Amino acid sequence: MTSVAKVYYSQTTQTESRPLVAPGIRRRRVLTKDGRSNVRMEHIADKRFLYLKDLWTTFIDMQWRYKLLLFSATFAGTWFLFGVVWYLVAVAHGDLLELGPPANHTPCVVQVHTLTGAFLFSLESQTTIGYGFRYISEECPLAIVLLIAQLVLTTILEIFITGTFLAKIARPKKRAETIRFSQHAVVAYHNGKLCLMIRVANMRKSLLIGCQVTGKLLQTHQTKEGENIRLNQVNVTFQVDTASDSPFLILPLTFYHVVDETSPLKDLPLRSGEGDFELVLILSGTVESTSATCQVRTSYLPEEILWGYEFTPAISLSASGKYVADFSLFDQVVKVASPGGLRDSTVRYGDPEKLKLEESLREQAEKEGSALSVRISNV
């Protein structure tokens, strides 16, 4: 009796098992190259209610154009709302001119005879302009209570809105944009070991404290019971030459993962650029100037992992004795020894996509026994 294969998702079990990459469909990634989630949430019960329960996070995550629109609408709305209340107070007290108040009548709010005047008084009170033309008299205690309530409520509202603005500006997200990952990962020998390498650089002079780079291998995994786990996550460890847990990220650094018998990458088709997996890289650290925790993310698909290449050296020494990091060389790679074969003595620089295409053409020509001359540019 054969067991029925099941597919497990985040919170949902379905009866159909589909690969991450279907034939003829462009390979999709869970995480974009700039670290944003590429997952769409659907069929969430009471989604709006859940967002309203956590207003602070909702407002901070809100895009700037909506935040500015909400900011303006909130202030204008409170001015108008309390203006209507002030107008109703004037109507109830008989302060309007069309009601024919007696000559010795003392209004609740002096010079408030129309809805426009009530709106202007509400605006002047809330913004503490205080022109002096419209003011509260001692005749109406209700007006005094209303003024206190308006100032207290609107002050709380201003504190909340201002706090969300400051929190959004101070988020370490913008600091994360000055941390750069290489566009491609490369596989070559390093210190006699086959390694998968990525390059990371800090483009600011201020440092990140306690940097750590971790990796997650995402792929479909089938258990012994026949269950297909969509996007199974496996840890992939990275280190620098010093094997330190906290590298000194003052210059562009290359992080290594040794592809040995214990590596989760050992059975993957890294050389062919094919396969159904995604390698997610996460760099975490503390911003030196603000002590806020910063996280930078990127991901690599199989075609973004280059076999038999190393990164071009991007650090040099100037005539004045200063180290220079040339970011025009940051993503460039050089053809080196093909892992498992002899070292190629010809050094080639250029665009990784072009190099990868030319290398595949060269290998195809060698298999057919024909001589093929491929010109590689230094662009």
UniProtKB/Swiss-Prot annotation:
Intramembrane region ranges (chain numbering): 115-131
Subcellular location as annotated: Membrane; Basolateral cell membrane
InterPro entries the record matches: Ig_E-set, IRK_C, K_chnl_inward-rec_Kir, K_chnl_inward-rec_Kir1.2, K_chnl_inward-rec_Kir_cyto, Kir_TM
Gene Ontology CC terms: apical plasma membrane; astrocyte projection; basolateral plasma membrane; cell body; ciliary base; microvillus; monoatomic ion channel complex; plasma membrane
Residues in compartment: Cytoplasmic: 1-61, 167-379
One function term, GO molecular function aspect: potassium channel activity
Impact when changing residue 140 to R: Loss of potassium ion transport
Consequence recorded when altering residue 297 to C: Loss of potassium ion transport. Results in a shift to a more alkaline pH for channel activation
Cystine pairs: 108-140
Function per UniProt: May be responsible for potassium buffering action of glial cells in the brain. Inward rectifier potassium channels are characterized by a greater tendency to allow potassium to flow into the cell rather than out of it. Their voltage dependence is regulated by the concentration of extracellular potassium; as external potassium is raised, the voltage range of the channel opening shifts to more positive voltages. The inward rectification is mainly due to the blockage of outward current by internal magnesium. Can be blocked by extracellular barium and cesium.
The protein's name: ATP-sensitive inward rectifier potassium channel 10
Gene: Kcnj10
